[in-house]
Each structure stands twice: as structure tokens, then as C-alpha cells.
Amino acid sequence: MVTKCIDPCEQQNQKRPVGHLVWDLIRISRYDKYNSFLALFSGVWSTLLAGALKLRNEPESTSVSFVLSRVVLCSLASYIFSGAGMVWNDWVDRDIDAKVARTKDRPLASGRLHTMEAMAWLIIQVAASTGLLYWMMEGRHVWISLVPPAIGTLLYPYCKRPTAQKFGIYPQYVLGLTAACPAVFGRAAIYNHEDSFQDLINASFPLCLFVFVWTLYFNTAYSYQDVKDDSKMKINSSYVFAGQHIHLFLVLLTGLVLASIPWVLHPLQSGWLWVSWMGVWSVGCAEQLVRFNANDPHTGGLVWRRNILLALWTIFACLVEVLLVWIHQI
């Protein structure tokens, strides 16, 4: 008589309640945390800034309700696409994550989630986010706009390998470029019929640059939390480039972040945004740099959380700008 041997993880998956599966799918996409918020910030900012600009210059061709509807669509599309990217990252890194204290309990790394389940979930999310973009952008410039973030998402986990470091490539570069791309979606949500794709790129570039250097800054601090485990496995990250000068490196990046804000704000000519964005970010970034301690890697997590709060505040500031412009037009 032949007895069939069943893998413990496979047996666990077979007996697992549906509720546990759903929760693991939520966790693998980071929908239980604020990580995926990173993907929606640039798109929401871009939509609100473009909406405020159009309300000021062409008030008869748009409305506050239209701008807000585009914000919702852009947020959902970016957030869901980011969730798919998280699945891809965890699938590629599942063996590495199993050896790192902070990530060993992730659904794929721990074996609770089967790879086929993860891939099916990834496809569902990509299809949903693409459908939302088609709706928001009315079918124009969708595929060409999706190419950069799709390539960045696919490459990101591989940029953490030692081989990438040999070519001077760090994962934060790719993550920054990917996080900046939704700014094009946001601009297209408002000016899709008026602007060519090149016009959309040109108008979005200042915000894309800001998001790129901002992501490089806070993700360098965030990934520094894993410096001990990452060093053992030779994981590539921008803090490796900084070495013992990690604090000085973060100061330099903060300077670039703040220097790029005026370029973003110039077309709006808004005193409110200068105070609520430039002013608040200057104070916030200074506070982060004071509290970051290179000898305590956990303070990198504090920098990450502070930047999420700054980003949420900036959504509020941009929303107020839209309302101020609308009130002025009444």
C-alpha cells in the first residue's frame, strides 16, 4: 500500500478557512497597512493641482464635483495597482523574506499563501486598476502611461540583489520612478482631451521629480530598519551607498525634496500652498532629521510614518486650494 505524502504547507492551505485566505490576500497587498498609500499620493496631488489650475483658468469647462470624481478614480486605480505590486514583490522575495525578522511572517514567506493564489490575486488587481484608468482617462494614453510603472514594479525587487549594486542601481531609484508615474495619470484625468501625451509629461515633470527625490529620501530611511539582517544577506539598498554617512545623505536628500517644491507650486501662484506645503514640509523634514539616529535603525520607521502624515496633509492642502479657487470664482 502506497501512502501519499502531503506537504505541510499544502495541507495547511487545503484546510484553511476562506476568511483566513481573504485576510492573507489583504495582507500581501498591504491593504491592512498604509504602505500602498505611497502609490496614490502623486496621482491625487496631481489631480487636485491640475483641477485647481483649470478651475482658475477655464472655470466654464470643469467643476469641483468633476475634479473630486477624478480624484476618487485616480486614488482607487493607483492604490489597487500598488497592491498588485506588493504581491509581485513578495513573490520574488519570498525566500529572502523568510530569513528577515520583520518580513518572515508575510503570507508567502511563511507558507500560508500558495503562489498560485498570489498570482491570481495579482492579475485581478491589475485588471481592476487598468479598468479604472480606462474609465478615468476615457481610453486615451492609458497603455503608454502604464508602461513605466509596470516596468518599475517588475524590476523593483530584483534591484535589491547584489548584482544591481555593481551597476550603481539601487531599488529606491526604481521605486521613486514608479511612485512618481501616477502624477501623469492625475494630470490626464483633468487635461486628457486638451493635452498630447508629451504635454502631459511636461506638465507633470516637476511633481514627478519631487516624488522621486522624496521617495528616495524616506525609503532610504525606512529600509535602514533592516540594516542588520540585510547586511548578512548582502541586500542592495541606497543606505549601502551612504555607508556611515547615512545621516548626511538623508540631509542632502531632504534639501533636494524641499528645493523641488517651488517648481511644483509655481504654476498655481498660491500663497496658501506655499504655507501649507512648503512651510509645513520644511518644519516636518527638519523634525525628522533631528529624530533620526543612525545608531538606532528603528528611527527609520519614524521617518516613514512622519512622511505618510505629511503626504496626507498635502492632500488636504491641495483640496483646500481647489475649494478656495472655486469660492473665488463664485
Curated annotation (Swiss-Prot):
GO CC term (a single one): plasma membrane
Chief location: membrane
UniProt subcellular location: Membrane
Top-rank EC class of the record's enzyme: transferase
EC code(s) of this entry: 2.5.1.-
Function: Polyprenyl transferase; part of the gene cluster that mediates the biosynthesis of 15-deoxyoxalicine B. The first step of the pathway is the synthesis of nicotinyl-CoA from nicotinic acid by the nicotinic acid-CoA ligase olcI. Nicotinyl-CoA is then a substrate of polyketide synthase olcA to produce 4-hydroxy-6-(3-pyridinyl)-2H-pyran-2-one (HPPO) which is further prenylated by the polyprenyl transferase olcH to yield geranylgeranyl-HPPO. Geranylgeranyl pyrophosphate is provided by the cluster-specific geranylgeranyl pyrophosphate synthase olcC.
Misc remark: The 15-deoxyoxalicine B cluster is a rare cluster that contains its own geranylgeranyl pyrophosphate synthase (olcC), in contrast to other related clusters which rely on a FPP/GGPP synthase localized outside of the cluster.
Similarity comment: Belongs to the UbiA prenyltransferase family.
Protein name as catalogued: Polyprenyl transferase olcH
Organism, as annotated: Penicillium canescens
